[in-house]
């Protein structure tokens, strides 16, 4: 990839629209599109960035196909990420060849999600220790975007070799999963849950920050390489478009976006605090696991380990964060009463399953080797629902009058998919991730 600085328009769009790691990967890849017409293709996708970014979150927000978000490289490649990425690549190329620009942008956005998810180490394996901190780690990653940007600006993006053959996208998903899986145990050993629940970036030490920047840069460059190959395969020329800052400003909905980001921040904070409270009280996280994590945990227990959930619930977990380089003798976070109460605040639908668990309390190894009892007695209640992501389709820029073909963003296609979601990181907290500084494009030497 070439060294490219973002234009003012690109920086405005990036800061206004991107709210998750998936968004940043898909958007930043546009500046790395190769070929003589790379800039023209970037401009086209900028016109349709709403569809690209909507697609980048669709597997989490719409499809909810949990198993397709993972690839367990040490467990017979359990998971469906390879097939889904290949499927959406083919769909994106077909739409490009038909000049259905907005639909193609959506399809490639979806592809970016299935490609990037296995480049998050916790999407390449499954352990009880990981389950405790999975959501917290992703929250910390999202809230550390400024640090990640700065590191990538310094080190640059890697050169990606695109394999030969019809299944090259599938092969690239596997290569990314293998690269990230090397950090699986590292993330468990180095994440400071105590620090991260109070201040998300503080949960990451130097080892984790370096690994995160490397993986995010790799995922971004990898998706750009796939997108470049898809453009080449579609064998069509990009239409000319007129990108103006004024045209973009006319579409701004800053108050709505700001409110949505704040709601998402509050929901993510509440989720992580509840998980932390359960861990402090029981030594595990079972009842407060997000729905996607629960589904993957249950499927993995059934299809890979072939054990009942009751047996899995009783297992001890490995110590967490024992190698964190920033650990200080600090007092644990004092949680609010609301967070403490949530451990006993279980939806009625889950009580039947919980009641079947072994009532015998056994010693379980908690954070850094402390011993904790296995579970509290549940009471029937409803857990507050997380805020749903608000989305709106917008027509942003006018096409130039020169070309015969006009560019008019259309609604992203509705695609029916089975399953439920898995996540890389659509998480924010008190200040939106969009405050991350813009960066130029640099290539690792």
Language-model regions, residue ranges each:
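N-terminal, motif-rich segments that launch catalysis or mediate targeting to/interaction with membranes
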Residues: 2-99, 103-106, 124-204, 209-217, ...
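Homeobox/homeodomain signature
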Residues: 104, 386-387
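Generic structural signal for well-ordered, non-transmembrane alpha-helical segments
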Residues: 110, 217, 221-224
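Divalent metal-coordination and catalytic microenvironments
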Residues: 113
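Short active-site segment of divalent metal-dependent hydrolases/proteases
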Residues: 116-120
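N-terminal, non-catalytic alpha-helical interaction modules of very large eukaryotic scaffold proteins
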Residues: 235-240
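Intrinsically disordered, compositionally biased tail regions
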Residues: 336, 341-372, 376-379, 387-445
């Amino acid at each position: 990839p070439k060294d490219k600085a973002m234009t003012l328009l690109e920086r405005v769009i990036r800061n206004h629209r991107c709210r998750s790691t998936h968004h940043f990967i898909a958007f930043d890849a546009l500046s790395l599109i190769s070929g003589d017409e790379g800039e023209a293709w970037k401009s086209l996708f900028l016109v349709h960035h709403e569809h690209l970014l909507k697609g980048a979150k669709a597997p989490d927000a719409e499809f909810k196909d949990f198993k397709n978000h993972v690839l367990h490289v040490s467990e017979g490649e359990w998971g469906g990420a390879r097939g889904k990425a290949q499927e959406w690549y083919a769909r994106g190329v077909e739409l490009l060849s038909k000049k259905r620009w907005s639909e193609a942008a959506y399809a490639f956005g979806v592809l970016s999600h299935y490609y990037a998810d296995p480049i998050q180490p916790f999407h390449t394996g499954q352990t009880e220790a990981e389950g405790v901190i999975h959501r917290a780690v992703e929250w910390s990653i999202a809230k550390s975007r400024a640090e990640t940007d700065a590191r990538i600006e310094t080190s640059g993006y890697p050169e990606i070799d695109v394999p030969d053959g019809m299944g090259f996208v599938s092969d690239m998903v596997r290569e990314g999963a293998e690269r990230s899986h090397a950090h699986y145990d590292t993330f468990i050993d180095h994440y400071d849950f105590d620090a991260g629940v109070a201040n998300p970036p503080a949960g990451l030490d130097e080892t984790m920050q370096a690994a995160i920047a490397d993986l995010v840069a790799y995922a971004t460059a990898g998706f750009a390489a796939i997108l470049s190959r898809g453009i080449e395969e579609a064998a069509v020329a990009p239409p000319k478009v007129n990108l103006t800052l004024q045209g973009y400003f006319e579409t701004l909905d800053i108050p709505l976006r700001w409110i949505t980001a704040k709601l998402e921040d509050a929901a993510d904070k509440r989720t992580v605090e509840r998980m932390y409270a359960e861990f402090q009280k029981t030594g595990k996280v079972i009842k407060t696991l997000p729905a996607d994590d629960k589904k993957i945990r249950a499927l993995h227990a059934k299809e890979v380990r072939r054990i009942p959930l009751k047996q899995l619930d009783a297992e001890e977990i490995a110590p967490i964060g024992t190698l964190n380089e920033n650990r200080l003798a600090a007092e644990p976070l004092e949680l609010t009463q609301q967070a403490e109460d949530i451990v006993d605040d279980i939806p009625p639908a889950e009580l039947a399953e919980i009641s079947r668990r072994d009532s015998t309390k056994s010693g379980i190894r908690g954070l850094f080797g402390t011993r904790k009892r296995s579970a509290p007695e549940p009471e029937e209640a409803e857990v507050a629902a997380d805020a749903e992501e608000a989305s709106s389709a917008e027509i942003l820029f006018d096409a130039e009058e020169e070309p015969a073909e006009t560019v008019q963003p259309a609604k992203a296609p509705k695609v029916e998919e089975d399953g439920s979601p898995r996540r890389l990181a659509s998480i924010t907290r008190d200040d939106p991730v969009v405050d991350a500084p813009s960066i130029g494009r640099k290539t690792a030497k």
